[in-house]
């Protein structure tokens, strides 16, 4: 008897499904946080500068980042993301804990530089941003819930203007950049 046959017999009737959920790299879904809000709590109206900034960010961000949800259930949410070099992720926080695992490239979180195999746990409510290195960064993002808030923190027009200027000024360079590893080929 082979090891596989012995394993199948040991599993019994559950062998057919086992309760498993499989994911395929080519079957991911676009990744969008379910709730995007400005700083100030779940029921607060976003600061006017944040509303304006998110509009600018949305108009200028194409080509600098891509993300895809790989798996999402009530108690686990896993996304893959690729941020190109210098992509200016706005300062924000979430109402759920998050863990990032770097697959390739590098990024700075605060004063720490993270590379392949490194990770960072970001507790709920902690404001943060990441700054991808010269080769960009690919990472997995894991949360205990698919239902989380994003609270943006930039409250001045000049903050959002600088982000939009960086986005617009990087488009030509980003058009030539390739994923450092290409775990899941996606187009930004």
Regions of interest found by a model, annotated:
Residues 1-75, 157-188:
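A short, N-terminal "cap"/entry segment at the start of jelly-roll beta-barrel domains
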Residues 74, 108-110, 133:
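Short strand-coil-strand connectors
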Residues 113-116, 124-155:
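Ligand-binding loop in jelly-roll beta-barrel domains
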Residues 67, 79, 87-90:
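Short, charged beta-strand/loop "edge" motif centered at a coil->beta-strand transition
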Residues 82-85, 93-108, 113:
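Short, conserved beta-strand element in jelly-roll/cupin
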Residues 78-82, 99, 119-121, 141:
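Conserved hydrophobic/aromatic beta-strand scaffold that supports enzyme active sites
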